[in-house]
Amino acid sequence: MIYRRLGRTDLNVSLLSLGTGGARRFGQATDMTLIDQQALLHHAIDLGVNLIDTAEQYGESESILGRCLRGIPRNQYFLSTKWSPRIGEEFVPDPVALQASVERSLKRLGTDYIDIMFFHGPRVAEYGAVVDQLYPVLDALRNAGKIRSVGLSTPFVYDPAQEVARIALTENPAMWDVVMLKYGILNQHAANHILTLADRYDVGVMNMAAVRIKLPNPVLLEELIR
């Protein structure tokens, strides 16, 4: 396995990570048993994967991970999770809800700290409120030792050019330790500005859903290659 320092953080992460979202949500959609979920997670760790990503919005993924990770030394893996400032389609920048969400995530994951806490997919028009009203909550939690790094993930379905990340790294690069982007064959917008800015300011980059849709499906993969 290849490892890299994730931006300015002190996290030396595996090039490949294990995600628990998408349509399957770590086997929730396919009725995978806890034994099989544990086997999958342990196999990934045995292969050298040490970065595991989840979110409160991924059904029971955090709780499942918490059970699967029992008995594995905490220094063998890094955890990233996310909180969305949305209720349905409504943007609700509630600092109290964010604080409560982090506490719930800690309890479900069975850990004293989260390595990377992301804002989950805020849109361009919402970015200012995230910075002014919500970021101070995560900054305080970082100072308290409950999170180690603060990140921003992009809502690429609503913002294919991922302008929110460009704005974040242009206006407030020192605030963001990590950004999570969608980058691949069919969406290379990040190469225009965002990756250059991330490199300039030593901001870590995580690529979401790198193999989730096309590569596991031979038919879609063949169509993509054609």
Predicted regions and their residues:
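Active-site mouth loops of central-metabolism enzymes
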Residues: 22-35, 83-99, 121-129, 157-159, ...
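Beta/alpha (TIM)-barrel catalytic core signal, keyed to glycine-rich beta->alpha loops juxtaposed to Asp/Glu
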Residues: 122-226
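Short, acidic/polar
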Residues: 30-44, 91-110, 158-170
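A short, structured active-site edge motif that brings together acidic residues
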Residues: 75-89, 119, 181
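A structural motif
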Residues: 49, 111-114, 147, 176
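Active-site groove signature of glycoside hydrolases
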Residues: 106-125
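Conserved, mostly hydrophobic/aromatic
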Residues: 6, 18, 44, 52, ...
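N-terminal binding-site loop/beta-alpha segment at the start of enzyme catalytic domains
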Residues: 1-77, 137, 143
